[in-house]
Amino acid sequence: MKFLDEAKVYVRSGDGGPGCVSFRREKFIEFGGPNGGDGGRGGDVWIECVQGLNTLIDYRYRQHFKARKGEHGMGSNCHGAKGDDAVLQVPAGTQVFAEDGETLIADMTEVGQRVRLAKGGNGGFGNAYFTTSTNRAPRHANPGQEGQEMWLILRLKLIADAGLVGLPNAGKSTFLATVTAAKPKIADYPFTTLHPGLGVVRSDAREFVLADIPGLIEGAHEGVGLGDRFLAHVERCRVLLHLVEGTSEHAGKAYKLVRRELEAYGGGLADKPEIVALSKADALDPDTLKNQVARLKRAAGGKPLVLSAASGQGVQEALRAIQAQLDGEDAADETAEPAEPWHP
């Protein structure tokens, strides 16, 4: 399945059904009076977060979603039925923006979350509603209220507890495959990973979701190499595991390049808790390993972890460091106040 993390859709709620002009006609009742019912309300447009989806690919082939109109009112004071709703199903992590691409309407973070995007129009009143002491037989009814319509932009930012960041070919996919059941494409060339991937890590009777973010290059915050798309997925991660390839020419420079991209992108990426690790340690001789660790320590301002996903060296230590950071984040999240919901 192709990975699609942005889509533009058109939504329209249903018009309300028109009211009915009707009079009671019954034997021996000369002045039966008005009995026209009201029209039904138009259907709403909802967006719903569901299990089992991890891409917005469905919205590449269908962009228009319209709820049904309300039914007409009828005689004998029968009101019209409400129109059927239209429901957009999206994966967790989807954000809904107005057409300008900046106004956030909804942030779908949990399975089962449901937000109304467009409210259906009210049904029109039938002539029975307009009966007064001076007008006992009104001959008019209301048309239904029009529904709402708008263009929306859907953006998917994968929700993960921890994210793997680094330059291309830093060993992120190998690490993900080692610690989870995920099976990302792995090869010895840059940009093997073209789409973000998720896996569930189970360590010390605990579990968390780990995201493999495609490699970043210089200029990623400006969209070079689709970097701005990839960085958007990092926004959702609570902790970053920054892998620096041990076989690179200079581990310190490689680390600083990625840090510059995180800072330039903004959105608080540079402020996220970060665990720094030197990867592919099994491919280095002792002297080279010592030099690369020293360079990375100077650049990062702290001693990095040393790991090799291929041999298993340092992997459990890295997982425990991630879990410790997540435990600290959980304590901070308990004091956060919920955001005010959006209403159409």
From Swiss-Prot:
It is found in: Cytoplasm. GO terms for biological process: ribosome biogenesis. It is an enzyme of class 3 (hydrolase). Signal peptide: none annotated. Its EC number is 3.6.5.-. GO terms for molecular function: GTP binding; GTPase activity; magnesium ion binding. An essential GTPase which binds GTP, GDP and possibly (p)ppGpp with moderate affinity, with high nucleotide exchange rates and a fairly low GTP hydrolysis rate. Plays a role in control of the cell cycle, stress response, ribosome biogenesis and in those bacteria that undergo differentiation, in morphogenesis control. This is GTPase Obg. It comes from Methylorubrum populi (strain ATCC BAA-705 / NCIMB 13946 / BJ001) (Methylobacterium populi).
